[in-house]
């Protein structure tokens, strides 16, 4: 999807297996930091040091999704942790991950709190795919808050002086027609399919590629 949207090849690198110098040598135009299936605690103590160095250098337009968003926040000093434990009697909406914790799970409207080019054409409450129980506990210093939900304040943020974005949701998990099964993450959340088209993530990604100068 990312190659089709951007019209450019997308090179895949693991969080811990790349360096700022390698990225400079590759001549990349933008950096997209994905979510993660493993818990952050399963990585080594310094596994993200180089990723944080890359993010702080901000030599290219950057966007992080879900866990990638959380690592951008961590690179700038924010605490990362679970939203909260479930209260007594509060139902757990899924047993797929993190039993006992509050989760945002499924297509969810987010409330735009500040305009930005990445949100062009999306209205005041675009719907994006959420699949998480952890969050950035604070907005990092030097960032602007762009969107929130009642359960997770830092849903979308941008560095004030550079096009460095973090999205707690998954913009890549969009659908273009009812029961669109082309995205594995959507299929995980909706095994029987999702009955509506939810294309806001596509628009946000296109907007990011425009901010990055990749799309006109």
Q: Predicted segment positions?
A:
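Flexible gly/pro-rich beta->alpha loop and the following alpha-helix that scaffold active-site loops
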Residues: 2-64, 76
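Pocket-forming structural segment of enzyme catalytic cores
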Residues: 77-165, 169-174
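Acyltransferase
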Residues: 172-216
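Alpha-helical elements of Rossmann-like donor-binding domains used by nucleotide-donor carbohydrate transfer enzymes
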Residues: 50, 144, 203-207
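Conserved H-loop
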Residues: 67
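Local cysteine-cluster metal-coordination motifs and their immediate loop/turn environment
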Residues: 71-72
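A SAM-dependent methyltransferase catalytic signature shared across enzymes that methylate proteins
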Residues: 7, 140-146, 210-213
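Glycine-rich, phosphate-binding/catalytic loops in enzymes
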Residues: 47-52, 79-82, 146-148, 183-185
